Amino acid sequence: MGCCGCGSCGGCGGGCGGCGGGCGGGCGGGCGGVCGSCTTCRCYRVGCCSSCCPCCRGCCGGCCSTPVICCCRRTCRSCGCGCRKGCCQQKCCCQKQCCC
């Protein structure tokens, strides 16, 4: 649950049992701890990384891509203006780059 995938192959299925198809590299820095953080896509929530880059899935629906830092907090469930579940710079925003 919430394991970090290879990115290029779309993440690991079956509870992080491994990536089939032989994708190399992928995450690069990878996720620390139990996918508590992605050094590449900067998604800060435990169990948020199903595939490291370019998007973090399962974390309030937030999408992270450098250089824009998008953080997902459970307190930000809605931005109220079209952006379903996006948090940018710890504030709810409506920019497309902050939403998945």
UniProtKB/Swiss-Prot annotation:
The keyword Cell wall biogenesis/degradation does not apply. Disulfide bonds: none annotated. It comes from the Eukaryota. Residues 4-82 are annotated as: 13 X 2 AA repeats of CG. Keywords: Keratin, Repeat. GO terms for cellular component: intermediate filament. Human have a similar number of genes as other primates despite the relative hairlessness of humans. Belongs to the KRTAP type 28 family. In the hair cortex, hair keratin intermediate filaments are embedded in an interfilamentous matrix, consisting of hair keratin-associated proteins (KRTAP), which are essential for the formation of a rigid and resistant hair shaft through their extensive disulfide bond cross-linking with abundant cysteine residues of hair keratins. The matrix proteins include the high-sulfur and high-glycine-tyrosine keratins. This is Small cysteine and glycine repeat-containing protein 3. The gene is SCYGR3.
